[in-house]
Amino acid sequence: MRIFEFQFNPKAKKDRFFKTFSFEKILVGKDFTTNVYGIGELSNALPQNSNLLDKIAHLVSEEYRTQGKGVVNPDTVFKKALREVNNFLATEKKQGNTDWLGNLHLVFVAFSFFPRERKVTFSLAKYGNIQVFLARENQLVNIAKGKTLESALVG
């Protein structure tokens, strides 16, 4: 007799890390508020990089938190936060920490709400092999195709 075992909840791997974060009303301007969300995965990671995703999330949150109420355009803050993440990753690479190359997958999304104008804008950037789909009129569209941390999608 053959016995098959199905695992719907595979055991956690010690070399794979996931991080989700959300910062509600992290940026409050004169005419808008901004929420930032992110998802990250680091696979095949060494123990020394177990907190890499936490460091990236902290960088993003600090970049937003240090902005004052004088911010006019939330997209510039988003792009500045991405530059900080890029600089951090470049520094890690220069220091010889290259374990994350090819194993880091991130997506950042920022929604800015403009109540007076009754509009919402979003900014999106990704790094690595991650896909972001938009469901619209019974269709799924990969809106992050070809986008990277260097080329943010704003709309």
What are these regions (language model features)?
Residues 57-98:
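Helix-loop-helix
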Residues 143-155:
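Conserved, helical-rich catalytic subdomain that frames metal- and/or nucleotide-binding sites
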Residues 69-71, 103, 147:
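Intrinsically disordered, low-complexity regions
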Residues 137-143:
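A short alpha->loop->secondary-structure connector
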Residues 1-64, 97-125, 130-137:
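N-terminal entry segment of metal-dependent catalytic domains or homologous docking segments
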